[in-house]
Structures are given as structure tokens and as C-alpha cells.
Amino acid sequence: MAKIKIGINGFGRIGRLVARVALQSDDVELVAVNDPFITTDYMTYMFKYDTVHGQWKHHEVKVKDSKTLLFGEKEVTVFGCRNPEEIPWGETGAEFVVESTGVFTDKDKAAAHLKGGAKKVVISAPSKDAPMFVVGVNEKEYKPDIDIVSNASCTTNCLAPLAKVINDRFGIVEGLMTTVHAITATQKTVDGPSSKDWRGGRAASFNIIPSSTGAAKAVGKVLPALNGKLTGMAFRVPTVDVSVVDLTVRLEKPASYDQIKAAIKEESEGKLKGILGYVEEDLVSTDFQGDNRSSIFDAKAGIALNDNFVKLVSWYDNEWGYSSRVVDLIRHMYNTQ
């Protein structure tokens, strides 16, 4: 069986984890990485040792030369181009490019990869104009003529499957979401300048920081039935990985909390198996580290005020779960061609 050949632009948190997911997949082959800011020996070090996800234990990673990494026997070509138009993806056979720099998130900028020979681009961030797909929710709307897509955000990937189940079964009149979100790379280690978001410039390890998120509104893009019905905000908290969504909704059809739990459990074992999880144990955030599902509903943590108004809680490994979906979306696009 032919493998799906992928390239990664930007070897940061998501880029490296997408590489880990790809290298553990039988049907996906990582053929190239582009990052103008990291040398091959430093790439090897950053890939091998990860504070959150631990040391890479699968096969040896070493530098063959300044343009090639070896993952076991597998050669991966390394480029160092600042301009995405100049990356020769075609030379390596990379059909799908994961755009994970966080810089080229709109359609025009991401399209630069096509000039170098890539066939499709998956942006690992929300995009203002590229179509957004959340696996398990709306990926079936992808058509083979779409060349540039967004995998939305980690929070949208957690929220959308849960919101879909609730809306399909009971109907959502309106809702508010809060994500209690782990630290990410854009935050500061100590107080520093952040002109657009003053609170975001405060020390990440010492503060609970209220922040904005477009995740709830983005659900309206992947689930048009919920457009204008959800909004939300974030609290950035001093943990390094794993976040949790609190979705509070008013229901159209009255339902007891037990009925809601049963519906979510059923979907988690059916159509959304592997995407939506369901737990009844007394778990905490670190218990979900390395969980590759998008959203794990915590049956014990939620609470209903009455049969029309309910708070639902769902966990997600905002790094590993999201990176797993990037690769799943590529698989879906490949199989749809």
C-alpha cells in the first residue's frame, strides 16, 4: 500500500508532535521538514527530548548530514527556507504539507507551498479564510478540489464533537464556553511586553490569565446550525499541557443529566469512537496527557441546574490530541481524492 507522503513547515510544538504521530503511523511517511531557524543537530535534540511527552523511544534519530535526518533507516530531507514559495516539496514527493509555523494561516500565504510542488496544505491553526474541518464533525464536507484547509484549533476540536452530539440529540438554544487552557509558546516566562493583549504579557507560570478565544465562534463555521449560538473565553493556567472545556448550554428539548450522559456515551462508542471519549472515573488533567482523542467527556464533573440548563466538562490534550487529528485529516483528504 502506498504511503501518504507529508512535509512539515515549522518544527515547533505542533510540528514536532505531528512528526511523532506520522512516524508511528503505518500509512503515513514523513519525507521533509522545513525550518529556517533550527539546524539538523538541534532538530534531532528537540525531537528526541520532550518535557511533556517524554523521550522518543521508537527508533534512533540522528543527523546524516546538514540536509538529512535519519529516523531509524528512514531519511527525512531538511530545508531551511524562510519563504514558503522556495521550499522544493516536489523534490521529496511531499503531497501534503502541514503548515505549523503559526505565521502562514490565511489561504494566500499558505498557497505558497503549492508553488514548491505540494498538492495540499493543512494549516494547524484556525484560518480566517481557509475552510475549517474538524474530524468527526464536518470532514465529510471536504471536496477533492479544495487544496488548502485548516484543522481549526485544539479547543474547537474538543468543543465541536461535544456540541454536535448535544445539538443533534437535544438542540442547543444558546451556550457559553470556557476553556481552562494550559500554557502555550506565545506566553511569557516573566512579565513582558504584549501590546495587543496586556494580560497575556504577564508571567505564565505564576498567574491565571483571562484571555480571548475564537474557538466557540469557530464551532459555528464547522456546525452552521450553531452559528451565532455559542461564544466563550479562556483562562490560561500554569500547567504545561492538557486543557478542559466547560460548555454551559440551554437545551431545546428537556433532558435529565443522566439522559445527556447516556447520549454522549453512546456516541463515544459509535460514530465518534476515537474522537470523543467518556470517563466516569475521578481523573485530573495529567491523566489525559498523551490521550489522542479530541475530547474526553467527564461525566462526574458536569452538573445540571434543571432539565433545560446544563454544564458539561470535557478534557483534551491540546498538543497530542490535536496533532493526531492533523494526521487524521490528511488521511481523510487522501482517501477522498
Curated annotation (Swiss-Prot):
Binding site for NAD(+): 13-14, 35, 82, 318
Keywords: Cytoplasm, Glycolysis, NAD, Oxidoreductase, S-nitrosylation
GO molecular function terms noted in the UniProt entry: glyceraldehyde-3-phosphate dehydrogenase (NAD+) (phosphorylating) activity; NAD binding; NADP binding
Catalytic activity: D-glyceraldehyde 3-phosphate + phosphate + NAD(+) = (2R)-3-phospho-glyceroyl phosphate + NADH + H(+)
Subcellular location: Cytoplasm
Enzyme nomenclature, EC number: 1.2.1.12
Pathway: Carbohydrate degradation; glycolysis; pyruvate from D-glyceraldehyde 3-phosphate: step 1/5
Record site feature (Activates thiol group during catalysis), residues: 181
Main location: cytoplasm
Disulfide-bond pairs as recorded: none
Subunit and partners: Homotetramer.
Record family assignment: Belongs to the glyceraldehyde-3-phosphate dehydrogenase family.
Function: Key enzyme in glycolysis that catalyzes the first step of the pathway by converting D-glyceraldehyde 3-phosphate (G3P) into 3-phospho-D-glyceroyl phosphate. Essential for the maintenance of cellular ATP levels and carbohydrate metabolism.
Name of this protein: Glyceraldehyde-3-phosphate dehydrogenase 2, cytosolic
Lineage, top ranks: Eukaryota, Viridiplantae, Streptophyta, Embryophyta, Tracheophyta
